[in-house]
Amino acid sequence: LAGGVVQINLLVGRQVGSFFDGAIAWLNYADRLYQLPLGVVGIAIGIVLLPDLSRRLKNGDTGGSRHALSRAMEFALFLTVPAAVALVVIPVPLIAVLFERGQFLPSDTLPTAQVLAIYGLGLPAFVLQKVLQPLYFAREDTRTPFRFAVHSMVVNAALAIGLAPLIGFSAAAWGTTFSGWAMTAQLWWGTRTMGEAARADDRLRRRLPRTVLPAAIMGLCLWALTWLMADMLGREHVRI
């Protein structure tokens, strides 16, 4: 359950979305795009990191465990922060170019893009979960992530159901995103008792601004290009 909390939260979101016409399709199409970086980066890192951490912790290699965790976080953020910025800044062109054809009408593009942008805000959190969870699993602690997952699902359900009457179908996406950050925050807070092996090293702290700042500049450039190329992006021949 702890490892699949993202998928469970998405399922809850779809149940909430089922009360709104077309919302299930919009949620599904947006999910296709945001699951790509999550699957390629987050899940892959988690699979590689768990046995490495387990081996290092078993051998008492605290420094090596810290290095492995910090490099995993560094690599994850290096790839997912720019991806998240792109999903937030240019969701409309992405959806229009990839999906706008056949039964997917121009009127479907905007709500799908809205959901995609909201999911994009939570993408770093979803990926960081895959990096932080191995810290617990490597110590054979499955109860703590399970407890955090339950808390996260409560947050998701409360927000999705509570906000739906106020903001409509997008409440499902907001619930998923906020619950993702809630899960990540709990996992990070729980590592305080794990000692030096679970702390970010100086290299990660130095490189984090170098990841965020270029991603922000990229976002500004994408926004400007989208505005300049608005007519071209709307033409039929650029759709895949």
Language-model features: where?
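Membrane-embedded alpha-helical bundles of multi-pass transporters/translocases
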Residues: 1-240
